[in-house]
From Swiss-Prot:
Keyword entries, A-Z: Disulfide bond, Endoplasmic reticulum, Lipid biosynthesis, Lipid metabolism, Membrane, Signal-anchor, Transmembrane, Transmembrane helix
Record: residues binding hexacosanoate: 40
Variant or mutagenesis effect after changing residue 78 to A: About 95% loss in enzymatic activity of the LAC1-LIP1 complex
Protein name: Ceramide synthase subunit LIP1
Source organism of this protein record: Saccharomyces cerevisiae (strain ATCC 204508 / S288c) (Baker's yeast)
Annotated disulfide bonds: 53-75, 102-142
């Protein structure tokens, strides 16, 4: 009978290299990317008005406020409108009480305007917002514009 052939294993003379340095390199690159994102967020927070529209509120009477938005170059009429609507939906709770508001467009301001100076000029939109307990005042302030109810 024939004998089974023996299994021959050869050991490599070179030892496997430790992977710890690769781990440190990957961790360092990851931390560097996180730091870059956080630095960008910090830089834009300081110059927030330059990138976004800031809502400005002026109380009228009761729950009624006059609301408009100002900002830097990216705050054109579209940005002002979005900021006003976002502020209305976040600040007022229609489940507590119904809400009345109107948004009045200023036709003197062009749709795309870049207010880069300290004097931002007139706002493109102005809104009057209030709960229905003050609906008479909202109707008076809105005059001929459409009044929305939520």
């Amino acid at each position: 009978m024939s004998q089974p052939t023996p299994i021959i294993t050869t050991k490599s003379a070179a030892k496997p290299k430790p992977k710890i340095f690769n781990l440190f390199r990957v961790c360092f690159i990851s931390l560097l990317l996180i730091a870059a994102v956080e630095y960008f967020k910090y830089g834009t927070r300081i110059n927030y008005e330059w990138f976004h529209c800031t809502p400005i509120k002026e109380p009228q009477s009761g729950s009624v406020i006059k609301l408009w938005a100002r900002g830097g170059p990216s705050c054109d009429k579209r940005g002002e409108y979005k900021t006003i609507v976002k502020r209305i939906t976040r600040d007022y709770e229609p489940n507590d009480e119904h809400l009345s508001f109107c948004i009045i467009e200023n036709d003197n301001v062009p749709p795309v305007h870049y207010p880069i100076h300290e004097d931002k000029g007139e706002p493109g939109y102005v809104a009057y917002v209030g709960y229905d307990t003050d609906s008479e005042l909202v109707q008076e302030l809105c005059a001929d514009s459409t009044i929305y109810h939520m």
